[in-house]
From Swiss-Prot:
Sorted UniProt keywords: Chloroplast, Membrane, NAD, NADP, Plastid, Plastoquinone, Quinone, Thylakoid, Translocase, Transport
EC number: 7.1.1.-
Main location group: plastid
Organism (species): Nandina domestica
InterPro entries xref list: NADH_Q_OxRdtase_suD, NADH_UbQ_OxRdtase_49kDa_CS, NDH1_su_D/H, NiFe-Hase_large
Name of the protein this chain belongs to: NAD(P)H-quinone oxidoreductase subunit H, chloroplastic
Compartment list: Plastid, Chloroplast thylakoid membrane
Family: Belongs to the complex I 49 kDa subunit family.
Superkingdom of this protein's organism: Eukaryota
Length: 393
């Protein structure tokens, strides 16, 4: 009888791009020695759609529907960064009521994004129940979005100088009811997950990142704050009206997957505090800056020609971008979402560079999974929280 010999060669395995734990079309080429990970090489680009080049051939208004396809789980943030850039270029003031509405929508979108991170993350490490629970609260948020914007996901709600429409009658009361209900929902999650011994075994001490490493790799968002760095752009950049509310930056010092989970869970509670304060203090007044219309660039006279009278499509408003450059950023659920914009005295941007948080945060993955077990890849990748739409752009 021949005794089978032990395999001595390293094994190279493809994970993705169809694997359910890849959270999109991410492909990992993993080198294994048994169950131990020797090397990991991420392969990107399966969802590349040329979003930056499209922006250079569209006006800002025409481009707004495209941006919701970057991070399609936190679309309010991509819309916010898109309108913030021309607002700063043109020195356009946003009415106070519009700013409050923006904050409410941004924080609701942050909660929805964190919820849809939590469910699949728990499913990746073997806990299926929270995956079904999170859809209850997420559905309530989408009902609020649908009532205010008309769309559940791709909202197209933000406008240069304000928002597309005011909040409908009864919406504020409905949102306050949701906030009261959601506080009990977060408590339920913490009872179900946070002290679960099997969950702690899978995440505690896995994927450790020190504060120095987080800064050197350019990490942001919960990835940075879970490593002991108290950095939140809502506090640092003072954009919109976040300074008017009482809330705290959530952070942990352990730097592992458990710390990143705790940061996101606590951030949802802080978002509820911000929303409740904004709903109670929301001022009256206009929801858009009517002066923005003077920035509209007059169409060429050919639009009045006979041939164009039968075109039913109304020309979209355009805004001339002055000849300067700037970088704007917001604190998205996954980290720092930024845009580097160069104007050229034209209605089209000369350059529109997107700084997606997921792409930067994903760079540290090969270092985190080395010398770990194969099963830990799902835990570490899930704790990073990526959406391939913004990674590949």
């Amino acid at each position: 009888m021949t005794v089978p010999t032990t395999r001595k060669d390293l094994m190279i395995v493809n994970m993705g791009p169809q694997h359910p734990s890849m959270h999109g079309v991410l492909r990992l080429i993993v080198t294994l020695d048994g169950e131990d990970v020797i090397d990991c090489e991420p392969i990107l680009g399966y969802l590349h759609r040329g979003m930056e080049k499209i922006a250079e051939n569209r006006t800002i208004i025409q481009y707004l529907p495209y941006v919701t396809r970057w991070d399609y789980l936190a679309t309010m943030f991509t819309e916010a960064i898109t309108v913030n850039a021309p607002e700063q270029l043109g020195n356009i003031q946003v009415p106070k009521r519009a700013s409050y509405i923006r904050v409410i929508m941004l924080e609701l979108s942050r909660i929805a994004s964190h919820l849809l991170w939590l469910g699949p993350f728990m499913a990746d490490i073997g806990a299926q129940t929270p995956f079904f629970y999170i859809f209850r609260e997420r559905e309530l948020i989408y009902d609020l979005f649908e009532a205010a914007t008309g769309m559940r996901m791709m909202h197209n709600y933000f406008r240069i100088g304000g928002v597309a429409a005011d909040l409908p009658h009864g919406w504020i009361d409905k949102c306050l009811d949701f906030c009261d209900y959601f506080v009990t929902g977060v408590t339920e999650y913490q009872k179900l997950i946070t002290r679960n011994p099997i969950f702690l075994e899978r995440v505690e001490g896995v994927g450790f990142i020190s504060g120095e490493e987080a800064i050197n790799w350019g990490l942001s968002g919960p990835m940075l704050r879970a490593s002991g760095i108290q950095w939140d752009l809502r506090k640092v950049d003072h954009y919109e009206c976040y300074d008017e509310f009482d809330w705290e930056v959530q952070w942990q010092k352990e730097g592992d997957s458990l710390a990143r989970y705790l940061v996101r869970i606590n951030e949802m509670t802080e978002s509820i505090k911000i929303i409740q304060q904004a709903l109670e203090r929301i001022p009256g007044g206009p929801y858009e800056n009517l002066e923005v219309r003077r920035f509209d660039r007059t169409r060429d006279s050919e639009w009045n020609d006979f041939d164009y009278r039968f075109i039913s499509k109304k020309p979209s408003p355009t805004f001339e971008l002055s000849k300067q450059e700037l970088y704007v950023r917001v604190e998205a659920p996954k980290g720092e979402l930024g845009i580097f914009l160069i104007g050229d005295q034209s209605v089209f941007p000369w350059r529109w560079k997107i700084r997606p948080p997921g792409f930067i945060n994903l760079q540290i993955l090969p270092q985190l999974v080395k010398r770990m077990k194969l099963a830990d890849i799902m835990t570490i990748l899930g704790s990073i929280d990526i959406i391939m739409g913004e990674v590949d752009r």
